[in-house]
């Protein structure tokens, strides 16, 4: 879609405002090609509980709330598809603020460098120490419980995970 990057901020603001009534917020906005049409994909999450599963009914309500307003904002004769979807149960945690919302949640973590002989793990985010700016993770390696204090900058990649 032409000028998508210039519209992205406006779409984000508009959608966040409209979805407040459903306790939803934008996680990410993408412009994709689907067959020969442009697609605007808006990934949303619960604004109160970041990793709360969203059901199909609430996504339909979200689509109904924003569809016409986005048409008015974009004002294009080109055809495009609008998709409102959940950001997913294993979505990436992209910032320290998002990680703070993941306290007591099960996550998958890759570190930039080994810390105490650990480079990656799955475990709980158990606490945050604002004085040392570190998160404590609790996990098991070979049946042994481990706790690891990590600064957000030492994390290469982190996402929510499903514990089996």
Curated annotation (Swiss-Prot):
GO CC terms in record: cytosol
Matches recorded under InterPro entries: Ribosome_maturation_RimP, RimP_C, RimP_C_sf, RimP_N, RimP_N_sf
Compartment(s) of residence: Cytoplasm
Keyword Cell wall biogenesis/degradation appears in the UniProt entry: no
Similarity comment: Belongs to the RimP family.
HAMAP family: RimP
The protein's name: Ribosome maturation factor RimP
Organism name: Mycoplasma mycoides subsp. mycoides SC (strain CCUG 32753 / NCTC 10114 / PG1)
């Amino acid at each position: 879609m032409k000028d998508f990057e210039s519209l992205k901020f406006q779409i984000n603001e508009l959608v966040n405002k409209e979805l407040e009534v459903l306790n939803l917020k934008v996680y990410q906005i993408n412009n994709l090609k689907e067959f020969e049409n442009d697609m605007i994909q808006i990934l949303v999450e619960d604004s109160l509980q970041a990793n709360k599963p969203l059901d199909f009914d609430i996504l339909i309500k979200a689509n109904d709330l924003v569809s016409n307003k986005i048409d008015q904002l974009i004002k294009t004769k080109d055809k495009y598809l609008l998709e409102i979807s959940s950001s997913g149960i294993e979505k990436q945690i992209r910032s320290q603020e998002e990680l703070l919302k993941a306290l007591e949640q099960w996550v998958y973590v890759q570190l930039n460098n080994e810390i105490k002989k650990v480079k990656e793990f799955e475990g709980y985010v158990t606490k945050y120490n604002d004085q040392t700016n570190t998160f404590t993770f609790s996990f098991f390696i070979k049946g042994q419980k481990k706790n690891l204090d990590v600064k957000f900058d030492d994390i290469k990649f982190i996402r929510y995970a499903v514990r089996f």
